[in-house]
Amino acid sequence: MKRNIPAHIVMPRNAPKVKIQAVEGYRANITLCEPTLKARRETLEKIAEKTGAYVVHPFNEPKVIAGQGTCAMEMIEDIGDLDAICAPVGGGGLMSGTCIAARSMLPNVRLFGAEPKGADDAYQSLKKGKLIPQNNPKTICDGLLTSMGENTWNILKDHLEDIITVSDEEIVTAMKLIWERMKIIIEPSCATPLAAVLTPEFRELENIETIGIILTGGNVDLSKLPF
C-alpha cells in the first residue's frame, strides 16, 4: 500500500553505483555525504530538522533490529532445530536481531558472527570486552564497513560465542561457490558467513552438524565482479 510518505536516504559519496541506483528506483530522496560517521550523523540531523522526518537508524534502531531478527525466525520455522547460526557483522543490526530471535526459539543454539579481516571492529570489541570503533577499514565488503552501535554491541557481547574473521580471498571463494552451485547472485558482504563456516577454525568446532547461514544481499555491480 502506497502512503505517499517521502523517504530521505543519506548515503556516502563512495557508495556503490548499483546501491544508489536501487534507492533511486524506489523514488527516495538521496543526499550524499562524506564517507564518515560524523558526516553521516550531521547530514542526517540537518535533514531531520529541515523536513521533520522521523529518523530511522540503519542498524542501531530497536525496530530495525527486531525486523531483521525475522530472518532467523523464518529460517528456524522452516528448518527446525539448528546447532549453530552464522551471519555477517557490520553495524550489527542483523546479527543482533538474529541473536534475540534464535535464542528465544532455540535456547541452546550456538551463535557466530563473521567479519572481514580488514574490517574487524566487532571481533576486536568481543576480544577486548569493550566497543572498538572501526578504524580505516579495507575490504571488498562495502556493506560491512561501519562500526557497531551501542544497542547492537550490548546484544552481541552477551550472545555471540565468537566472531570469525576471513580474508577477502576467502570471501571471493565463498561468493563464487554460491553463484556457481546455488545460482544466487550475492555481494561480497553476503558471502562472509559462508567463508567463515568453511575455515579450519570453524570446522574444528565440536558438536556442530546443522548450520544456518543468513544470506544478506545481492547489491553487486556486475561490471565490477571480484572474479
PLM-predicted stretches and their roles:
Residues M1-F227:
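PLP-dependent amino-acid enzyme catalytic core
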